[in-house]
């Protein structure tokens, strides 16, 4: 086991001789930035809840969101696969057993498990943590799980310098149970859910209870809390993408310039800086989703308005062209039981109004007509 300083060695010897430890005693404060960002989050929620968009579009966004959550959360931990490859893995078109592929598949399974769990459950338990972590590292959901039984030092991959020395193994269960208890504590009921999610993400990754998968599990738990308590934004948001864009900001906000040793300040840390970062990231993510939903909504409303301008004849013609590619005067005459002159007069009116257009200007007889670009784009 490696230690960074003489003081780490002395502290380790001291703690090994004790049967109990002080619990985590993190602190935080509301700041103007946190309050303003919480307001932004709630405004975005109202927009997304209020504005209905086409179901097909909604499902496509959800599908894209899941792929991005998997991609960016595993990328943060060093996975080198690109987004398109991740999508293929999720769609079961890439069955490789290469490590990066397995990591993506495992994370996807854990995400799907928690999404389903959040529909009927909103608590955090040790059993839930074990199950999620089992899936993250590729074990069966109900496999026997244990916390790490030794020290798990986090090092800089390039310099090999110690970045973080988490609590000793013997303290993990106490710290996890404290985290769970405080999350469910009645006195914490008035704390906004985004802040509670941020606290859980920080505390879990700080406790670092497992040998591997701690960062991924911490982000999964935060997303689980947001979904379970109605902050999932219909499954449209991806905070991990914002983390990845400025990965140094993410790590610096977690570390907050504190000593690398858990016992030298991290267990008593003021995490306001981290919460400002977490809530700000969430607000930026939610605002982006809200703006996207507004744009989709307005476009879909325009489509509906165009359809509303069509009478029964025009609706039939639009549907006929969509199914057959084009229409002739004789097709209209046959369906509506009118003569060709009347059908051609209707067509002339529709051409002048910008509803129909000749498919080929060189045609003189038996002319084919199609929808104008305006209607082709809006009527699908």
Residue ranges and their predicted role:
Residues 1-380:
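FIC/Doc superfamily catalytic core
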